[in-house]
């Protein structure tokens, strides 16, 4: 029993240390407090987190255009939950601009991270959107 609890705690800890969870948190903080400077504490994923956060923020207009052009009938960004929108934007940034990471890895990592922030039905919706979009953005992956 104790071994099982220890394993479960470590499993949760390792999931919680996912760099994509940190990306989502940083983007949410930026959305809620746009004037605040974004802090990137030292970690093995610091460069990755900084690249994705800055890239998502800098290219948010382009990402929004991508969503509108590929998913106009599937999603209304004005009515989309803020956290879902943040996760979607970060994942699309990676799909469009981080070609060194396979699309399946990007999607599965954001779906895992989304479990901390979204309801199960929203995670399913996110999965469908990312799957559809990834097929259009990365045909050769």
PLM region descriptions:
Residues 1-116, 122, 127-141:
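N-terminal interaction/assembly modules
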């Amino acid at each position: 029993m104790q071994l099982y609890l220890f394993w479960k705690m470590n499993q949760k800890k390792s999931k919680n240390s996912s760099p994509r969870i940190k990306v989502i948190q940083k983007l949410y903080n930026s959305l809620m407090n746009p004037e605040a400077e974004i802090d990137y504490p030292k970690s093995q994923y610091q460069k990755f987190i900084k690249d994705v956060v800055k890239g998502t923020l800098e290219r948010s207009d382009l990402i929004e255009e991508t969503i509108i052009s590929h998913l106009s009938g599937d999603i209304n960004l004005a009515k989309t939950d803020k956290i879902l929108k943040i996760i979607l934007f970060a994942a699309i940034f990676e799909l469009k601009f981080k070609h060194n990471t396979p699309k399946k890895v990007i999607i599965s990592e954001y779906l895992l991270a989304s479990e901390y922030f979204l309801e199960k039905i929203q995670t399913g919706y996110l999965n469908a959107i990312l799957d559809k979009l990834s097929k259009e953005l990365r045909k050769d992956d």
